[in-house]
Regions:
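Terminal substrate-recognition subdomain of acyl/acetyltransferases
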Residues: 1-173
Length: 173
């Protein structure tokens, strides 16, 4: 909740992650906040907050909280952190919700149609509508389809880089 976040913020914590769906038991969004106690902690806080700020334009469309997350520099190009997240989504088991910002930046970078991904993320179609449009049945089949479209876009953008990150993701399984 916003009052709970204000409390932690007044204690010096900085928000670095927030879930995209409220928890069923509490109705609150999951969140992670950091209070750095060392130079390394400050570096971690800075990097994590920058990542959240970069993803916030897309996350706030799904989160019903009026939070100000400053620090987005407007850069929508794909960086190495995005490639790692996208490889985790396309070639491993990273959830779509945990990859929203990177997926949105991928859609901006790719000129492929990617109808299921664009339908859900850019046109805000329901998963059921995306599955019907893609000709697949069920949430698991749709997720496989989204992963496939993501892999296609990565391959199209940079085949060598895609192979590197695919191999990296598969080495972790």
């Amino acid at each position: 909740t916003e009052p709970l976040w204000r409390f932690w913020q007044s204690c010096g914590f900085e928000l670095v992650r927030i879930g995209s769906k409220p928890e069923a038991s509490s109705g609150c969004y999951t969140a992670m906040a950091i209070l750095p106690l060392s130079e390394q902690g400050e570096a971690l806080r800075h990097a994590a907050h920058k990542h959240l700020a970069r993803d916030w334009p897309w996350l706030r469309q799904r989160i019903e909280l009026a939070l100000a997350i400053p620090g987005d520099d407007g850069d929508t190009s794909l960086g190495e952190e995005d490639w790692r997240e996208l490889a985790g989504f396309a070639f491993a088991h990273r959830p779509l919700e945990a990859s929203l910002g990177a997926l949105q930046r991928l859609l901006l970078a790719s000129n492929l149609p990617l109808p299921a991904l664009r339908g859900h993320l850019q046109r805000r179609q329901s998963p059921a509508a995306c599955a019907e449009q893609a000709g697949v049945s069920g949430q698991k089949a749709l997720l496989r389809h989204w992963r496939h479209e993501t892999a296609q876009a990565l391959e199209q953008l940079n085949a060598q880089h895609c192979r590197y990150w695919r191999d990296w993701a598969q080495s972790l399984q």
